[in-house]
Amino acid sequence: MKKILKRILLVLLVLVLLAVCGFAAFYFSRIRTIQSLEKVTDYEDYNLYRMDVQYSYDLDRLISYGISSNQDMLDAILKESIPLLPIHMTAPNYGCSAFSIADSDQEILMGRNYDFKIDTSSLLVHCTPKDGYESVAFAALSNISANQPDASLSKKLAVLTAPFICLDGMNEKGVSIAVLTLDSEPTVQQTGKQTIFTTLAIRLVLDRAATTQEAVDLLNSYDMFATSGRDYHFYITDASGDGRVVEYDCDDPARPLVATPIR
C-alpha cells in the first residue's frame, strides 16, 4: 500500500513539475517583458515608465475572438496578453487634441495632449513585432489600475496588456496616430467585416501601415466598435506630411469611415 501511495505521489509530483515548467516556458517572453519595465522619472505619485514588449502577439487572432461589447474587448486583450491569469482591467477614456507641423528643415512633427479628468502615470511601449513595423507608443496606466506598475506582481502582469491599450504612437516608417474623443453617439459598425476596437486600431496602424493612405485603407477594412460608451476619431500623419482626420460619419446610420485631409 505504501509503495502504491509513493508511486501516486511521485506521478503527481512529476505532473506538477511539468505543469510549472510548461507555464514558465510559455511565459518566458512575458517575464522578460516585465523585467524590461523601467522607471524614467521619479515623482511622488505619477511617473513615466518604459517597457520593451518581447512576447509575440497575433493581431489577427485577437480580432478573431469577436468584439461586440466592452467586455468582449477586455476579454480579447487579456486572452492575447495574459492568457490563463485573472487580471482586472477597465475600459479606457480619452480626450485630447492633436496637430502636425513642418519644422525649418521641412521635417514633419506631430504632437498631441491628453485632457484626462484624472491623473495617470504613462508607459512608453516599445514594440518590435516579427511581421510588423517597430514602434513606440504611450499607454495611460490608470486605465489598467497600475499607476505604480512595479509595486506588485498583479500590476506587473497588467502592463502586459500595454500593446493593445495605447492612445497614440509612431512607427519606424514615420506614421503617427492619436485617438481623440467626440461627443457623438459611439460608433458601432455592422457591415459584416471583422470588428476592431478603438485602441486596437492604433496597434494595427503602428504595426502594419507605412503611409497615411495605408492606415486609412487598413481601418476601412474592418468594422469599428467604439469603446467605453464614447465616440472617437483618429488623427493620422506620415513622414510626407499627409495628415488626415479619420472619423465615422454621424449623419449616416451605417457610420462609414471618412478621412478628411488637414489644411
Where are the predicted features?
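Extended amphipathic alpha-helical segments with heptad-repeat/coiled-coil character used for oligomerization
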Residues: G229-R263
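Short, well-structured alpha-helical segments that form the helix of a local strand-helix-strand
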Residues: T212-D223
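N-terminal mature-domain region immediately after signal-peptide cleavage
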Residues: L5-A210, M224-F225
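N-terminal secretory signal peptides that target proteins for export/translocation
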Residues: M1-K3
